[in-house]
UniProtKB/Swiss-Prot annotation:
Function (record text): Involved in the synthesis of autoinducer 2 (AI-2) which is secreted by bacteria and is used to communicate both the cell density and the metabolic potential of the environment. The regulation of gene expression in response to changes in cell density is called quorum sensing. Catalyzes the transformation of S-ribosylhomocysteine (RHC) to homocysteine (HC) and 4,5-dihydroxy-2,3-pentadione (DPD).
Protein name: S-ribosylhomocysteine lyase
Protein family: Belongs to the LuxS family.
Catalytic activity: S-(5-deoxy-D-ribos-5-yl)-L-homocysteine = (S)-4,5-dihydroxypentane-2,3-dione + L-homocysteine
Organism from which the protein derives: Haemophilus influenzae (strain ATCC 51907 / DSM 11121 / KW20 / Rd)
GO cellular component: cytosol
GO terms, molecular function: iron ion binding; S-ribosylhomocysteine lyase activity
Named cofactor requirement(s): Fe cation
EC number: 4.4.1.21
Binding site for Fe cation: 54, 58, 128
Keyword Metal-binding included in the entry's annotation: yes
Length: 167
């Protein structure tokens, strides 16, 4: 099985909240695709609650599109990481970390503006596979934490995992 790029970075050196360009690709037709690691929590020290990350998934995807999509950028997907320390965002385009960070902070402000559970998009049995597994309160706490701590940048060259540690 090939070793995925996400496992070639040293998680003990990651800062959070922080943006990292995880991967860039050029499609056969010449489109740039960028995958971002949006790290909310310090790996192995903090974790997002299941209900909080699920609610954030419903809110964050739309808010990030509101703040980041434009003529040269289109978000393909924003998905929570299995380790529950952040999200991966794949998009067409090449925004820099600062632009992504600004959109992320604005999105966290938007999350705080959601006043009640009924305002969470797609929160119903038809559009959500675990529609009872949500917490707006937890999502608000996550957003407050990101805003209070600020968003830094993780660089791949600073996180390169020593080959002796690759398994």
């Amino acid at each position: 099985m090939p070793l995925l790029d996400s496992f070639k970075v040293d998680h003990t050196k990651m800062n959070a909240p922080a943006v990292r360009i995880a991967k860039t690709m050029l499609t056969p037709k010449g489109d740039n695709i960028t995958v971002f690691d949006l790290r909310f929590c310090i790996p192995n020290k903090e974790i997002l609650s299941p209900k909080g990350i699920h609610t954030l998934e419903h809110l964050f995807a739309g808010f990030m599109r509101d703040h980041l999509n434009g003529d040269s950028i289109e978000i393909i997907d924003i998905s929570p990481m299995g380790c529950r320390t952040g999200f991966y965002m794949s998009l067409i385009g090449t925004p820099n970390e600062q632009k992504v960070s600004e959109a992320w902070l604005a999105s966290m402000q938007d999350v705080l503006g959601v006043q009640d559970q009924a305002s969470i998009p797609e929160l119903n049995i038809y559009q959500c596979g675990s529609y009872t597994e949500h917490s707006l309160e937890d999502a608000h706490e996550i957003a407050k934490n990101v805003i209070a701590r600020g968003i830094g940048v993780n660089k791949n060259e600073d996180l390169s995992l020593d080959n002796s540690l690759l398994k």
